[in-house]
Curated annotation (Swiss-Prot):
Membrane topology type: Multi-pass membrane protein
Molecular function, one GO term: 4-hydroxybenzoate polyprenyltransferase activity
Family matches, as InterPro entries: HB_polyprenyltransferase-like, Prenyltransferase, UbiA_prenyltransferase, UbiA_prenylTrfase_CS, UbiA_sf
UniProt entry tagged with the keyword Membrane: yes
Cell membrane in keyword set: yes
Protein name stated in the entry: 4-hydroxybenzoate octaprenyltransferase
Protein family per UniProt: Belongs to the UbiA prenyltransferase family.
Role according to the record: Catalyzes the prenylation of para-hydroxybenzoate (PHB) with an all-trans polyprenyl group. Mediates the second step in the final reaction sequence of ubiquinone-8 (UQ-8) biosynthesis, which is the condensation of the polyisoprenoid side chain with PHB, generating the first membrane-bound Q intermediate 3-octaprenyl-4-hydroxybenzoate.
């Protein structure tokens, strides 16, 4: 069992934290906004750990669902499940255990948060199969990756206001943007095996679609900033996020594999500076209030 532990870590992508960060930033945005910049530390710990666990569970389920496809894709052919180093039942068991631990984590929280967690579990578990039927599965991924937003508001306020759903919509656009960049890396392989992705659906308009999704995401965050009366610190973070999006254009415009993958990974910075702007606004507002 211990000898297989490194394989299990690879299965759940512990060696590749970018996916966890892409889930974490919008969740932190929601926690900070819902609590006016003062989230309780136990609640913060629950959401951070829960995000890491559910992302890991999602990776295990994704590899299980795609095990017959991944062996035909250059980037994924050597994954533990695809290469036969672990069995399919092990991946499912790991996903179930991680999801169960995540559910235990939220037991101290209110009923609404627990109810939303059931929806989140269904969306996360069903996402890997959307690539067979849905032309833009990245939009469904945005719901799965962003469901921590309504859950955060529910945990803090015991309600889910319209603002939370607007933030979720922003996350859907952002997910389509960065996961289309990711799909552009595997475009040739996906054509051969018949997987549906946004990169194939958008076709020659893929770069334009990515940039429009960035524009929609950041446009929604303009509305959020204006509606909540955010100050200069927030807008500095927002401007830095715009700069990240423009930098991504320089990476993806020629549709080359490695630059597209670099653009995908760089979205960690886009999410990070946007959160930094939100956190800095509340920090400075609290300091000014004192």
């Amino acid at each position: 069992m211990l000898a297989r532990f490194p394989l299990y870590l690879r299965l759940v992508r512990m060696d590749k934290p970018i996916g966890s960060l892409l889930l974490l930033w919008p969740t932190l945005n929601a926690l900070w906004i819902a609590s006016d910049g003062h989230p309780r530390w136990p609640l913060l710990a629950i959401f951070v750990l829960g995000t890491l666990l559910m992302r890991s569970a999602g990776c295990a389920m994704n590899d299980y669902a795609d095990r017959d496809f991944d062996r035909h894709v250059k980037r994924t052919a050597d994954r533990p499940l695809t290469s036969g180093k672990i069995r399919a039942w092990e991946a499912v068991a790991i996903a179930v255990v991680l999801a169960f631990i995540s559910f235990l984590l939220i037991q101290p929280l209110n009923t609404l948060t627990k109810e939303l967690s059931v929806v989140a579990l269904f969306v996360a578990g069903s996402y890997p199969f959307m690539k067979r039927f849905f032309a833009i599965p990245q939009a469904y991924l945005g719901i799965a990756f962003g469901f921590g937003i309504p859950m955060a508001f529910a945990a803090v306020q015991d309600t889910v206001p319209m603002l939370a759903w607007v933030m979720l919509i922003a996350n859907i656009f952002w997910s389509v943007a960065y996961d289309t960049e990711y799909a552009m890396v595997d475009r040739d392989d996906d054509i051969k095996i018949g997987i549906r992705t946004s990169a194939l659906t958008f076709g020659r308009f893929d770069v334009a679609a990515v940039m429009l999704c960035y524009a929609a995401t950041l446009g929604i965050y303009v509305w959020i900033g204006v509606t909540l009366g955010f100050g200069l610190a927030y807008w500095a973070g927002w401007a830095a996020a715009v700069g990240c999006a423009l930098y991504h254009y320089t990476l993806i415009k020629d549709r080359e594999r490695m630059p597209c993958f670099a653009a995908f990974r760089h979205n960690n910075w886009l999410g990070g500076v946007l959160f930094a702007g939100i956190a800095a606004h509340y920090l400075l507002a609290g300091t000014a209030g004192n």
